[in-house]
């Protein structure tokens, strides 16, 4: 099976959002929430044709009457039945095509358990009958998207943050570090500190409003204490936000206090090191000969790295941690929200990649464990 004659599909399954589209495109065709909703009460919606589940945006819009579940927790698939529903929705409702006609490239979190890779492979070949399949580590794809093959990727999405050093296209597993702190936690923290101001948000519907406030108004301070002092003396950083019901709220130092948790997870009651210290720790776990190249190729990816000011702050903190002669360079490409998907699109459309696919024939001969031989 050659991937030449037909477009390969690239699906990046994140904890918060699923990004899917065609290899060779410069952006995903569809982006929707990785969520499956089931009715809380049987038979309350007359004439709905009683669907037993809803996926993505439809689940979000009906969230008042549904129980929402995210099948991917902290980057790892934990509920395969729901995951299958998300893939089904991706192929048939979002992309509107027959999966048995297209090679599929999926992404996985670093350190994804072996059994998970096999299960993914099995579902793709046995349930969806894809002609060819490949699975790639998310951070490695982000690095490809930035035009590098060596560097260290700070990938922070909705459910998990990873620091992944990569040398000549291969990740260095012994130095990969994971922090269970990402976008969802920052949204929750913002809900908490807004409630101190007297604005209460509690339901899952209200959490979406706070996520929007976070995405539109939050930023990372270059000097946190200095910023706090400034904000207490003037109202220059105050911004107003209109809620769906027309009420207008004012948000001040919460704008930079929420993302500060990335650098000081202790404010969330977490023992973890911040993203700056974790990046440094990861570099120090690598061979002394590659460190210089890693310091000068620090690449940010994922939606949680989209805060204004984050690259400058990272530059400042890492320059302070690194040896004084070391050149620290942070790359934060504007399309980094989708750089995992973009990297997948680039990889799957390379002529040299076409012999890398696991074909249906190879799968039938060797079974799911073939994935460990062909995808690394």
From Swiss-Prot:
Q: What class of enzyme is it?
A: hydrolase
Any idea which UniProt keywords this protein has?
ATP-binding, Cytoplasm, Cytoskeleton, Hydrolase, Nucleotide-binding
Q: What is its EC number?
A: 3.6.4.-
Annotated Gene Ontology cellular component terms? cytoplasm; cytoskeleton
**Pfam families hit by this protein:** Actin
Mainly localized where?
cytoplasm
Q: PROSITE patterns, alphabetically? A: ACTINS_1 (PS00406), ACTINS_2 (PS00432), ACTINS_ACT_LIKE (PS01132)
Recorded GO MF terms: ATP binding; hydrolase activity
Q: Which reaction does it catalyse?
A: ATP + H2O = ADP + phosphate + H(+)
The record's comment on protein family reads: Belongs to the actin family.
What is the protein's name according to its record? Answer: Actin
Q: Taxonomically, what lineage is the organism?
A: Eukaryota, Fungi, Dikarya, Ascomycota, Saccharomycotina
Q: Which gene encodes it?
A: ACT1
């Amino acid at each position: 099976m050659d991937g030449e004659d037909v477009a390969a599909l690239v699906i990046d399954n994140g904890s918060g959002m699923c990004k899917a589209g065609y290899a060779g495109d410069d952006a995903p065709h569809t982006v929707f929430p990785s969520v499956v909703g089931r009715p809380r009460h049987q038979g309350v919606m007359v004439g709905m044709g009683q669907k037993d589940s809803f996926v993505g945006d439809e689940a979000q819009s009906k969230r008042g009457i549904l129980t929402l579940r995210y099948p991917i927790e902290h980057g790892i698939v934990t509920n395969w039945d729901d995951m299958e529903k998300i893939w089904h929705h991706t192929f048939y409702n979002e992309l509107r095509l027959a999966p048995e006609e297209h090679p599929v490239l999926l992404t996985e979190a670093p350190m994804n358990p072996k059994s998970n890779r096999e299960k993914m492979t099995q579902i793709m070949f046995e349930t969806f009958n894809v002609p060819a399949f490949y699975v790639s580590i998310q951070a490695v794809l982000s690095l490809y998207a930035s035009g590098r093959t060596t560097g260290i990727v700070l990938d922070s999405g909705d459910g998990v943050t990873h620091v992944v050093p990569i040398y000549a296209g291969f990740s260095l597993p012994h130095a990969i570090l994971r922090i269970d702190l990402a976008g969802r936690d920052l949204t929750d923290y913002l809900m908490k500190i807004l409630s101190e101001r007297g604005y209460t948000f509690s339901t899952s519907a209200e959490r979406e409003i706070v996520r929007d406030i976070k995405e539109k108004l939050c930023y990372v301070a270059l000097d946190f204490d200095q910023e706090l002092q400034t904000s207490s003396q003037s109202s220059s950083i105050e911004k107003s936000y209109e809620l769906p019901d027309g009420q207008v709220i004012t948000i001040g130092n919460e704008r930079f206090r929420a993302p500060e948790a990335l650098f000081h997870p202790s404010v969330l009651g977490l023992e973890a090191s911040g993203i700056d210290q974790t990046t440094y720790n990861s570099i120090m776990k690598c061979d002394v000969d590659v460190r210089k190249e890693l310091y000068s190729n620090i690449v940010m990816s994922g939606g949680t790295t989209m805060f204004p000011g984050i690259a400058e702050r990272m530059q400042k903190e890492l320059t302070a941690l690194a040896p004084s002669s070391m050149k620290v360079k942070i790359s934060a490409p504007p399309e980094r929200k989708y750089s995992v998907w973009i990297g997948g699109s680039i990889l799957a459309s390379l002529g040299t990649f076409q012999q890398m696919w696991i074909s249906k024939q190879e799968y039938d001969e060797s079974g799911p464990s073939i994935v460990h031989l062909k995808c690394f």
